[in-house]
Structures are given as C-alpha cells and as structure tokens.
A protein has these predicted regions:
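PLP-dependent aminotransferase-class I/II
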Residues: 97-139
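N-terminal amphipathic/basic leader segments beginning at the initiator methionine
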Residues: 1-19
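Conserved PLP-anchoring active-site segment centered on the Schiff-base-forming lysine
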Residues: 70-88
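Structural motif
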Residues: 2-3, 52-56, 76-78, 101-103, ...
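Conserved N-terminal alpha-helix of the aminotransferase class I/II PLP-enzyme fold
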Residues: 13-60, 82-83, 87-88, 93
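Conserved core of the PLP fold type I
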Residues: 53-72, 105-107
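Structured catalytic cores of enzymes that bind and process phosphorylated ligands/cofactors
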Residues: 6, 50, 54, 109-110, ...
C-alpha cells in the first residue's frame, strides 16, 4: 500500500540508499563533524546562498518545529486551517517546543483566505493576547 501521509511511510530513492551504503563503509565523527555533512552544507550554500545556515533534522515534525521556533517567540500565535498537519498530526510538538498558541481556523476546504482570518487578527500590542506572528499553509 502506498501512502503519502508522512515521509516516514516509504523507503528511500535508490540513489539515496546507494549514498547511505557508501557512507556506511568507514567510521566518521558524528554531530556534523564529518565529510558527508560538510559536503551537504557546501551544496546547500551553493544552491541557496553562502550565508545560509543549514539545520539538519530527521523528520518533518522536526523541520516544522525548527522553522516555527526561528519565526516565533512564546508570546506569539500561529494560524492554520483546522485541518493543518501541525494542528492535527504532530501531537502537540509545535506547541510544546515553541510555547506558541496554535489558532486553528475553520475552513470549508482547508484553504485560508483573508476573509476567514480577519476575525482572528486582533490584540496587536495587547499584553493579554498572544501576538499573531505566523501563518502555516499546507497542501
């Protein structure tokens, strides 16, 4: 059975497995002090910008949490459709790790519009309200 619900549900592309097998032949220092990480960082900087700082994580939840942590502080709120992956499928990890409030918005089709969000955009500068900061969009 094929499932696209998570990146954890399938095997890797044969080229990825081939690269893993090549890397598995010898010993390497861990925690980013190895030639494989150095090569990956160089390729990422070449592709995007020399100033970027790649942060490697092992799954989608980790990448979502890191991205949200970089954009928010604990007094912020994150808006998303009520069907959004970060609200439905990540077991509270984004809330726990960011300290932010996730504000799910009811939608007829999982798509947010300015009109649907309008009633949530209040409390700016009010210390008694979490401050709107991020909008999570998923397919």
């Amino acid at each position: 059975m094929r499932s696209f619900a998570s990146d954890n549900n399938s095997g890797v592309h044969p080229l990825v497995m081939e690269a893993l097998n090549r890397a598995n032949i010898d010993h390497s220092l861990g925690y980013g002090d190895d030639k494989w990480t150095e090569e990956a960082v160089a390729k990422i900087k070449e592709t995007f910008t020399p100033n970027c700082v790649p942060l490697f994580v092992f799954n989608g939840t980790g990448s979502n949490v890191v991205a949200l942590q970089l954009m928010t502080r604990p007094y912020h709120s994150i808006f998303c459709a009520e069907t959004a992956h970060i609200y439905v499928d990540e077991c509270g990890s984004p809330v726990k790790m960011t300290g932010c409030q996730i504000r799910p918005i009811a939608t007829p089709d999982g798509k947010l519009t300015p009109e649907l969000m309008q009633s949530y955009l209040h409390g700016f500068g009010d210390q008694h309200h979490s401050q709107p900061r991020a909008l999570y969009i998923s397919q």
